[in-house]
Amino acid sequence: MNLKKTKMIRMGALVTAFTLASIGAATTASAKPSGFPVVDKQKATTLTIHKHVGDEKFGKYAGEQRIEKDPVVGVEFTVTPVLCELDLATSDAWKTISKATVESASSCVDRESKVVKTAEDGSVKIDLPQGIYKVEETKSGNNLVSTKSAPFLVTLPMPKGDNEWVYDVHAYPKNKLTEPGVPTKTASEPTKFVPGAEITWTVKASIPVLQLPYESIVITDQVPAGLTFKEVTSAKIGNETLSAGTDKADYSVANGVITLTPAGLEKVNSAMAKASESMPVEVNLVTTVGMDISTTGATTNKVTLTLNGKESEPGEGTTVWGNLIVNKVNEKKELLDDAVFSIYAGKCEAVTSRSTPVVENLTTKGGVIAQKLYVGKNESDSKDYCLKETAAPAGYVLDPVGRTVTVKAGKDATELIEFENVKVEGPDLPLTGAQGTAIMVATGLLLLAAGAGTVYVARRRNA
């Protein structure tokens, strides 16, 4: 019997009966000179679906089993009995079957469909009664299916050649798969230049347009030490803005993991039906800078995009911080406590009385202050700061001249500066003030005492 090859249309191909996806058979029989015998209604029939990556081809049923590479695991197929009124043992049935298409073949009222999934080897075997079935790929599982297999019709048993029935039928529908792209991640300038600052990160990616709906979309912010995940401020896929915190939220967030809910997936899949090759993704999230932020090289913040269980290579963004150490000393290089400093962004010549300090009231303990400061987004960056003393230690004069310090990124981004104070000591003066008068009074009292003693001794002698 000649089987016609029909035109396959994407997302709903019309396939004539039995021009199957490279269908093979488990058993073969020796050639016979006569035509087809009557179908043995007592024989059990099976259908084995083999799902692999590749280009799909349709043609006459050849009855060959093949060993295929690249199995596709977890793909769901729905097998639906159709044209149940036909008796495959009659020639009239085969006249109807030869003209049947996937769309025209009516489902059976009193028989249910079977839903099956491919195993680790990409195959699934189904025991089915003799009859005609429509086979459709209905879910992708943990796969990104850019081209799904076309639906097809199969009879159990299946005619092979000119005179043979095959009761154990094997079909080889193929997929074209794709992979998630690598996302990018860019840091904005922090809200302030010291720990406690917040940094907004912009994550961008694109998700491919699939022929089957997305079953899961997850964005994972892999927050490093020194940063703490705070919140997601916005999320958008294609032209769809995703919302959170409502009764029907589009995504949930837990410890930096952003997971689309069924409502969010519905939005994405609806938008995908109108898209071409890919849809842009943009998520803005916020982290807080901790006191433990590293000052030895860049702090790298990674992000991954997981589509239907397939995780992308991580994308990453960086933020760089340095450490400014100030030693407060006197002329003898002795460390001084209780000096108070403020730090301003930029060079000192640009700092005015109206400038707001980055940090203030830094007081030396053990003669030292240490302050972590923002440098930039890359390890090649540097940033200028102005260090100003606002109160000198007791006994020392305030130094009003600021010091411009350039904090650079690097393996050791520590800048050390000595800030010297002069002790207040006036010159020696003649003792003409109260101190001199006191000395003269004391001398006079001594002379009076000596005179009184002399008079007393003289009177005793004359007595």
Model-derived features: where do they sit?
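Solvent-exposed loop/turn and edge beta-strand elements of beta-rich ligand-binding domains
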Residues: N2-A463
